[in-house]
């Protein structure tokens, strides 16, 4: 299975966070091939469409190929409109030079199986991790990639390709409220730096009550690792909804 963390190690996770961390968000397969065509066959778990996600972002595939040192978009694996079995071309009609490929997995679904297909006789081999360092990002739907058009368009993935850094996406849409289990996950995770998008979901009261303990728990295991906290975004849903505006204003 392509899961972000071993959820069995964290029984204190809520059912929603457990489900989200089984998703393949931010995970990618790196390989080399000289094939002119690349296809994929994959199996997902959920059948219901997402309310704020494209079908490709939710359970499709997103391929990039390195050209002149840069990752360039190459194609998508479009999933079936219903069901959990998917098969589709990802890119076709290429030349036969050897290519380094980066295939992102779905943002909002769990992958039960994945097969990558090439032309008969074409070489297909695993490639080494192309990214240096390890930056772990824990956050809200913004980090998770909600409303991104494709799996590779979540900001953690975009930064990874642009900077050459390895970003680990631990976003949990709507759930990241400085809970102690997120602090435990960070404390037990190897990282060169942490980025926290942890002010978007909680209330001002939750931030006041939880932030100090959250940081203390992580610092016990990572005394010198950079902890980078992002400011919450401005929610345009509060342009006219006074309750939502007050909720956000209280955090500033």
Where are these regions (language model features)?
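N-terminal secretory targeting modules
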Residues: 1-134
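Short glycine/proline-enriched coil/turn segments at helix->beta-strand junctions
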Residues: 34-36, 163-165, 223
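Short hydrophobic segments within beta-strands
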Residues: 40, 138-139, 230
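Short, structurally constrained coil/turn elements
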Residues: 57, 161, 221-223
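Short C-terminal domain-edge/linker segments immediately following a structured domain
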Residues: 70-75, 132-136, 166-170, 201, ...
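Short N-terminal secondary-structure initiator segments
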Residues: 74-80, 133-138, 170, 210, ...
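Serine-esterase "nucleophile elbow" of acetyl-processing enzymes
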Residues: 93-97, 101-190
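Alpha-helical cap/lid subdomain in secreted, periplasmic
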Residues: 172-175, 179-252
